[in-house]
């Protein structure tokens, strides 16, 4: 219902409007959902409120988009071939979304079936924190997608590949810093939040950190896939990756429990999803011979991120402060050490210099608009 109007705002990089509308309707949704559970104790009402709120969000967004961009009015008829092309792209995009849903849902289903609801509840607490961090970084991807898509059309291949390396550098610093934070803050935070009886072993924390880093790097590639609109060429990859994840889930959960479930997702992305999408991107958007250079760059960034995690783990082991004071201290250490390491190793590279200039430019723009 009117969801297509979102694309107008996204194309003009006005996601701030969508965010404001979503904030308003989500607040309204949560209030009604609390009331549905508290007063009526009805899960059906809870779900109905969610559907109603989404419809309201779409309508409000459509009204605002129509007022800001009154020139964009649907009229006339499309050519039959163009309609067929659009329908084909929708089908290809659908398979991509279905694959992502299967990957995200399979882990919980397998844990529930093989390890029980108690283990699932503990796992979900850790996963909730992970998805919260992913959601914060997702703002960067959402804001950049339209600009990347425009650049892929108007700029040459050399410029776009330079932008890819610059974007990868920025996300790698963010992902490395966040992975370090998760490694050193997961257990102390769970202890403060839920208590020691709701904590998994530290091996699970390491698995979650690896999962997070691989997910964010994979997200870079998916952003370029979406911006370039190469869903048809990539249509089978999400489904095959999801199938591989499910098969490894069923196999590894019997031997390693929760660790096997998390690692199966990591392995399915590393061994199936990422090589496949890199091949698709570099055979469509960039030169094929540049893929090796890009993979080497990813490995270098991963190595420095790993070094940062090890170093911060060593430093944080000396922090004896408990509670929120200890969390704040660990956060400071992690957010300083990893970026400093990236600076020391990559400060003379073109992509790091370009990334630094871009960040300074963005900060100046924010400061100028804030006055």
Where are these regions (language model features)?
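Alpha-helical transmembrane segments of multi-pass membrane transport and lipid-handling proteins
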Residues: 31, 35, 59, 161-215, ...
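Interhelical loop/hinge segments that connect adjacent transmembrane helices in multipass membrane
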Residues: 43-47, 59-105, 109, 147-162, ...
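Interfacial/gating helices of multi-pass transporter permease domains
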Residues: 43-48, 81-89, 111-131, 162, ...
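Alpha-helical transmembrane segments of polytopic membrane transporters and translocases
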Residues: 55-56, 92, 107-109, 121-138, ...
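Membrane-proximal transmembrane or re-entrant/amphipathic helices at the cytosolic face
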Residues: 286, 313-371
